[in-house]
Regions:
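Long, well-ordered mid-to-C-terminal structural blocks that present hydrophobic/aromatic surfaces
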Residues: 484-541
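Active-site bordering "gate/hinge" segments
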Residues: 1-486, 655-673
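Active-site lining segments that contact anionic ligands and/or coordinate catalytic metals
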Residues: 487-489, 504-506, 513-516, 545-549, ...
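Dual-mode signal for accessory low-complexity, basic/Gly-rich regions
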Residues: 518-590, 594
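Short, glycine-/Ser/Thr-/acidic-enriched flexible segments
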Residues: 256, 344-346, 395, 444, ...
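Glycine-rich, charged/polar anion/phosphate-binding loops
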Residues: 375, 423-424, 476-479, 492-497, ...
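Extended hydrophobic packing segments that form well-structured cores
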Residues: 602-673
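Generic beta-strand/beta-sheet core signal
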Residues: 252, 278, 391, 440-442, ...
Length: 673
């Protein structure tokens, strides 16, 4: 489509929308909804004009803070209780027939802020035209049926599936997308007005991070960036993958870290890698604060309104076509380098019956789509040629002692990896003598789990456990394996854990032959709500998941620091998994790359790269992979013992009463004092 035609479509749409707030052709209660949405879209048009006039460059920081808040004000704090974006209010105000559909429309129009700031006129215009189409329906003498409204939204999603898929592919592999990169590389980072150029919601977390990093010397910033970029390079080195044939890396970070990211961009360019930086499909790759996490949670299943088999097929066809179109860029893509953040108050969502929920058939469709999509991506971005690194830093919200905690995390991220590599080898040597590992909790922790290990045909050349220090997952350290499922049986329990930004109280999983057979938590009063919470956010609508990983974290320094500052509950799994034994539900760490040999520093091959489920990949990949991998850690304070069980019935104690007891590992207890 030509720019001229697109501009004409936009002009016609916004001209019509400007007229709607004064009209009375739509009956109540829908009139108020459409009028409010029209006012919002007019506000987006005004913001677009002011950006084009250079307002983001000339306004004061105080003025920009007000400007930044305007697109989000309807969902912030108590305002959300009477917002049409709240499904509970929308259904109450607009009725059962249309409340959920119009609430879904509200969320879709809420994406306009991104399209406006990035000047993505096609998406903005298409959403406006959808709004006008629905408005015209409600102007008719007879109100539209619920099905008619749903079909209109369905065709909007279907008609633009190819355009959206193209942009999603480009967000991963195309370095010519420069919106975020320009902000990072061209802004005066000492002038915090730059934070408002993204259009993301900016809070004291983002401002405080940028302000604090501005107190660092350039040498300190370069060192932080070097830890991160070297982790990425080492990931390829350790896995014996050739980084030299790659051309791009995807940088993902939270707004406020631009000084570090600018240094990292320059360092990646020295490696021959041009960064690709974008928000991502769900605005999680480069993001500011969430204006309201409950709002995000309420809309997590909005596609339940229109998801069907035809749409899944259309999306998969579009994905295949677009990856093929960008196959050269995809082949040069090395992987993501991620800067995570932590420290926000753990979010405990409210389950709302008025929110959209996938039915059983749609759950199967989503799982099927994820499986097929994973196979398409792996054809163009081969896992055995791919790497990644992840590092994490705290946000100011974590504690009044934020600056001290931040510097402690910097130290933890740069611990002596050679020391941990040496100590962890003692653990691996002991573990390789075993047929299984028994893990027992203590106190309120009810964990009692036996983890089965693969048989080593040649212990002199083979090992079950990878000696993991600070490459892919920063900081050090852990040893991990893909357990054998048969015989892996028992209960995994944690009194409280924060997984993927959601809190679980008294999470309990029962495993039989390595598969989850029962699950519960204590987040909600009703057992059904607790099970649904786990099914949606941990099982991801799979009926069951295998245990994909068993590991022993060795970073006692991080654990003691977390206890000292009382922040253990706010740490991301990236750090928490190094602070005790942990178990991952879902795919193994070697998903899609099981046939690529992996070696430890001592030269032994890590042979535990698959389990009984992932072994099905050669016959039917859809039965081998789940598209998820969620780590659950038992902290040392809740740990009675970890012991290797040998085939002859004898045991080798590794941890007792939360302390390492295996000869050669005692040094790990020093941080405890």
């Amino acid at each position: 489509m030509t720019d001229e035609l697109l501009n004409e479509r936009y002009a016609l749409a916004i001209e019509r929308i400007r007229q709607i707030p004064a009209e009375k052709s739509v009956p109540q209660p829908y009139r108020d909804f459409f009028a409010q949405m029209a006012q919002y879209l007019c506000k987006m048009d005004q913001i677009r004009s002011r950006i084009a006039e250079g307002y983001l460059k000339t306004a004061s920081e105080e003025e920009l803070a007000v400007f930044n808040r305007e697109p989000y004000e309807d969902v912030i704090g108590e305002r959300y209780e009477t917002s049409y974006g709240n499904p509970a209010f929308a259904v109450r105000a607009l009725g059962e027939t249309h409340g959920r559909s119009l609430c879904c429309l509200y969320r879709e129009l809420g994406n306009a802020v991104v399209w406006v700031y990035e000047d993505r006129l096609l998406e903005l215009t298409a959403a406006m035209e959808l709004y006008l189409e629905l408005y015209a329906m409600f102007e008719e003498e007879t109100l539209p049926s619920a099905q008619y409204v749903k079909e209109s939204i369905y065709w909007y999603v279907s008609d633009y599936a190819e355009e959206r898929q193209e942009y999603q592919v480009r967000e991963i592999v195309d370095p010519s997308l420069h919106f975020v990169k320009d902000i990072v590389m061209e802004s005066d980072l000492t002038d915090l007005r730059y934070l408002y150029q993204y259009g993301e919601y900016i809070t004291e977390n983002e401002k405080g991070t940028a302000r604090f990093l501005n107190t660092f010397s350039q040498e300190e910033i370069d060192a932080m960036a070097r830890t991160y970029t070297e982790g990425f390079r080492k990931c390829f080195l350790v896995a014996r993958k050739d980084l030299s044939k790659k051309k791009t890396v995807s940088i993902r970070f939270h707004i406020g870290f631009e000084r570090m990211i600018r240094a990292a961009i320059l360092q990646f360019r020295e490696m021959g890698l041009e960064p690709v930086i974008s928000r991502g499909a769900r605005r999680t790759w480069v993001a500011g604060a969430s204006a309201n996490k409950q709002y995000d949670y309420d809309h997590r299943n909005d596609e339940a309104l229109y998801l069907n088999e035809d749409l899944v097929k259309r999306r998969l066809r579009a994905m295949q076509v677009k990856y093929d179109e960008y196959k050269e860029l995809a082949g040069g893509y090395a992987g993501p380098a991620v800067v995570e953040t932590f420290g926000e108050v753990p979010f405990e969502p409210v389950n709302k019956k008025q929110a959209l929920h996938l039915n059983e058939r749609q759950q199967k469709l989503r799982v099927g789509f994820q499986n097929e999509a994973g196979q398409i991506v792996n054809r163009y971005i081969k896992d055995d040629e791919y790497g990644y690194t992840i590092i994490a830093y705290p946000m100011p919200e974590i504690d009044p002692r934020y600056e001290k905690i931040f510097r402690e995390i910097v130290k933890i991220n740069t611990l002596d990896y050679e020391k941990y590599q040496r100590i962890q080898q003692y653990l691996i040597d002991a573990l390789d003598e075993g047929a299984s590992v028994q893990v027992l909790g203590k106190g309120e922790n009810r964990t009692d789990l036996r983890v089965m290990l693969h048989h080593l045909n040649d212990p002199a050349k083979e090992t079950n456990f990878e000696n993991c220090v600070a490459d892919c997952n920063i900081p050090v350290g852990e040893v991990f394996t893909s357990p054998s499922l048969t015989g892996t049986t028992g209960v995994l329990h944690v009194t409280g854990v924060y997984l993927n930004e959601l809190y679980y109280r008294d999470l309990c999983l029962t495993l039989t032959d390595g598969m989850i057979t029962a699950y519960d938590c204590a987040n909600f009063e009703k057992e059904e709500d607790n099970r649904t919470y786990i099914e949606e956010n941990l099982l991801y609508h799979h009926r069951t998941l295998p245990i994909g990983e068993f590991a022993i974290g060795t970073n006692t320094t991080a654990y003691v620091m977390a206890e000292q500052y009382s922040i253990a509950g706010k740490l991301p799994i990236l750090i928490a998994e190094k602070m005790g034994p942990h178990f991952a539900m879902g795919d193994t760490c070697y998903a899609w790359a099981e046939d690529s040999p992996m070696y430890n520093p001592d030269g032994k091959e890590v042979i535990a790269r698959e389990n009984e489920v992932s072994a099905k990949r050669k016959e039917d990949p859809s039965k081998a992979y789940f598209g998820c991998h969620t780590d659950i850690t038992i902290p040392y304070r809740e740990l009675q013992s970890v012991a290797v069980e040998k085939a002859d019935g004898t045991t080798i104690p590794l941890i007792e009463e939360g302390r390492f007891v295996l000869p050669g590992t005692e040094e790990l207890n020093e941080p405890f004092g």
